[in-house]
Amino acid sequence: MKVVLLSFTLIIMGTLFSNAQTSKSATQSLSSVKVEAYYFHMSTRCVTCKAVEAEAKKNLESLYGEKVKFQAINLEDDANKAIVEKLKISGQTLLLVKGDTKINLTNEGFMYAVNNPEKFKSIIREKVDGLLKL
């Protein structure tokens, strides 16, 4: 009888320990999700459009390295149709994404990338830092 009770207790303990490990690894996986930055653009671009991409990419790489993945995506390229539809993009857009959270920095990019790049950098830092804390 003691052997049966001991065996039963060990099985229950093993199951609980296994579930705790699974839960812990799932939590770690979620917290390691990176922030993604997308700059959606047309084929023909003005000086400001190019500056938004260049400044955003430079700032994200210098501030965050591999913690933030930057991609420039041509809206007119059919190969990009899936990501454009997934993120519901309809025009030139600078977008930060982490999971279901999206932050649109298009207006800030066009206001500051050329005339006040330091202000643009501080806005990027503020928004990305907020996403990394999620």
Describe the predicted segments one by one.
Residues 1-26:
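Bacterial Sec-dependent N-terminal signal peptides
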Residues 29-62:
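Local sequence-structure signature of Cys/Sec-based thiol-disulfide redox active-site neighborhoods
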Residues 34-35, 65-69, 90-92:
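Loop/turn elements at helix/coil->beta-strand transitions in domains of secreted/extracellular proteins
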Residues 42-49, 53, 87, 113-121:
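Solvent-exposed, acidic/flexible segments
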Residues 65-80:
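Thiol-based oxidoreductase modules, predominantly thioredoxin-like and allied folds used
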Residues 84-98:
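Structural micro-motif
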Residues 96-134:
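Non-catalytic, surface beta->alpha helical segment in thiol-disulfide oxidoreductase systems
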